[in-house]
Amino acid sequence: MNRHPALSLDLDDGIDRKVLGQLRQRFLAVNSGRLQRARQALSSRQERVLRLLPLLFHINHPLLPGYLSASTPAGLSGFEADDEVLAEAQRLARSFVYKPRRQEPAQQPIHGLFLMGSLGSLAQEEQSDLDLWVCHAPELEPGARQELRRKCALIEDWARSQGSEVHCFLIDVARFGQDEREDRKEPGGDGNTQHFLLLDEFYRSAIWLGGRTPLWWLVPPAHERRYDEYCRTLLGKRFIRAEEVLDLGHLAHIPAREFIGAGLWQLSKAIDSPYKSLLKLLLTEAYASEHPRVRCVALRFKEQVFAGQLDLDELDPYVLVYRHLERYLREQQAPERLELVRRCLYLKVGRKLGGRQRQAQKGWQHLSMERLVAEWQWEPRRLALLDSRSQWKMRQVMEERRTVVNELTYSYRLLFQIARQQGADSGIDSRDLGLLGRRLYAAFERKAGKVENINPGIAPDLGEDVLTLVQLPADDDREQAQWAIFPGALGAHQWPDYAPLKRSLRLVELLAWCHRNGVIDSATRLSLHPGQSDLGDAELDNLLGSLRQFLPVPLATVDDADLLQPRRLKSVLLLVNVGVDPLRHHSQMNLHMATGRTDVLGYAGVRDNLVLTLDQLSLNSWNELTVRHYAGPQALPECLAEFLDAVREKPGSPPQPPELMVRCFCRNRAAAIAVRVEELFRETYGQLLGGQPSRYLLQIRQQYHLLEMSPEAVSHESLPDLPSLLQHLGRERDGYSALKLDRHALEGEDLGLILSMGRPDCIQVFYRRDFDSAEISLLDERNALWRQRQALRDERSLLAPLQRFLQSLLYRRNALSLEEQVPASLDIRYYELLSNDGRLHVEPREAPEALAGPALYELQALLERGERKRVQVTLYCDHQEFSELEYGAGLFKAVARHILAHRAESEPYPCYLTDLDLSRLFADEQPQTLHYLRYKSVLETALNQALLEQ
């Protein structure tokens, strides 16, 4: 059956009916050989299913599977049940009696049954599915098609009970030829853009079970472009009868959109299962390189049948694909890629050739692969390596991964380039290309902090039985300590002689990598050499348990909907103080500290910070796992600010809060640390969800940290002491910003009480009397802080000047509100800070009456820009003008003399501004109260100094 005379057909020379018959018999002989090979790998029950399928579609019998009613579409064109099939049916149903149908073949609704997939091929497995094409007459009514679908479902159920997975696909022959399939779930494709490539696969690999045979068989491969002309002649001149053939179309032309679309589809599948998809991926690449004159594999198959080359091994669908790729890659001078194709084919077939096996026990697949491997000149060592794939560990997988990733990346770039060259003709939406690009990026792109997935379907299990975890000390070769993982159980004097599987500066990053890639699983035993760290076996076990809880592997495939959106955090694991004892000194001395100050951010009398390090593991919606390490005094606020900035609501995206886990397993105060950190993160996240600009004040030891939150960004500023905090709080603001205090911030400070009472659209005045002086604090309408200490004579003289000034501002503001759409009038509220048994509290006070009097001399200031942007001052005392234009540097002395001349009392006392105009300084915006108070303080200081000097 290896070599037969070549056969040819030519319309111009006339068609020989005998040659047509010989061609049909050749294709049927190849089909018979494939069917026989398919049966060899099946169990007796599975073989029964295969034998009975034509009969089940030929008749409706209540004793046989698939029966719905006598009127359900049935009747396989030209089918006659032989004795072997009838005997099989009677073994299934003893009382079954076969009654031949009296329909003419042309009237029978089932035109053909074909098996697709790997059955009968080199890659057939014990559990290969049976993908069955049920080709039916185009005139079937919708109701009849629905009945046929139900019949198919019943047959699938019965086959499943026999240990076979059968999947039926209804094919309307006429519509299929016009690329209008009714079943868009065909095997091996995305179902939408691969019509001709699917037809190519059908013609080269389908096994005919019964009914009409493909008309395509009888059209010479050299004349594929005259397919329609040949078909008209063969049918019109009755060289063949119409009821003997079915026409699914030709392969003269494959549109660019098909091989680009198929390449994208296969590339997407190859990310998780490279060996299963790389062959088809490279095939589409080869087709794309030949476009527009593609000689697809099915045509080469037909060429060999016409040429009389009927060796079943060489006509095997997978060998045909391999030969096509071999030619293509040799032309491309790509031997490394050809070797990858060979490995993919070898692993796809799954026959281990490295071990010894008796010749009589070798199946046809084994023998066929032996011939190929001998042709490739593979050494036994290579076979042994591939045969042990199930035992491959990290080093072998890493080496193979480099090749696979390079191949996938190259294929994507090539497809992208071809799609751009084809432009609109490619039929590929840029969305699809972008989607796949993101999928590749998420799976394989390296970036700082990202935990690599080294095993994209290369080996089934990377788990190690025993590993050694070591902290490598800093030395001449290493500027700082590192962590490394070694295979096996190594002692302290052994590991320096071995190469580690993986090393990292950070322990958590190393453990996350081991867990993500399955190197450490629940059965792995670990030997620990902690070095200078405080890591113990119990903490290590807890860390690994937390990783397993946080990141169950393998991860689910990312949905397209997620890839179409920007990345967002799905879940976060915070590990606090990994390998660090925050109270190491006490632990070494075996001391237990008793204290009433238990906050872990200000612990005991010295206000120690017990949160020394944080490791944040983040899983985003693209399944990217990243690790970030934070250490030092800024660790917690930096981690918190970056977390909040990552989870803040993005424009156009609804808020989707990530799952948050916080764990701490250090020796001292672990539970309290974890609870405190988690509460802090949840509280600030809740504040962020408010959607309005706001601030959060955190105190760690004696240092303050202010988080600025807005829909646009989250930032963090550290302030080393209280004066720095006051200066920061006194900055002008663009709008109101609420300020929330951590529950332990500013404990015992009156500032904490003041800041916690901030309200919008309100000016709040707080005062605290201390013997001969008082401190006034004011929160303006934008929640900015102004603070001033001044001499205290009595409560009236303390507050009345300020009230008079604030009322003047409100009058000015109200007058502008109608013209410039300034917000409505503000409330002015007064509070006194009092101490009761050492505990501060606040009591509201009535606003003082701003009556005219000696201390409330009418004094107005007007400021405007002079030359070189210098502020120029004009003062009005009882409506008399004093300007710098007239008095120059002596302005304040002139005003002081005027004031003293009008005083009845000789005793000096301060003077206060009663009104201030800044409209010339803030022409484009409304100044906030803070601006007025700043200028007021400067002017009053200068005036009162001049009064003292008189």
Question: Model segments located where?
Answer:
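Nucleotidyltransferase catalytic cores
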Residues: 1-91, 179-183, 199-950
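Short, charged/polar micro-motifs that form catalytic or ligand-binding hotspots
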Residues: 103, 135-145, 327-334
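Short, conserved secondary-structure transition motifs
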Residues: 164-186
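Acidic, Ser/Thr-rich peripheral helices and adjacent loops at domain boundaries
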Residues: 187-195
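E2/UBC-UEV (E2-variant) core
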Residues: 147, 151-165
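Well-ordered mid-protein domain cores that form the structural environment of catalytic cofactors
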Residues: 68-127
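Catalytic metal-binding acidic patch
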Residues: 114-117, 121-147, 165-170
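Amphipathic alpha-helical scaffolding segments
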Residues: 130-140, 147-153, 342-343, 359-371
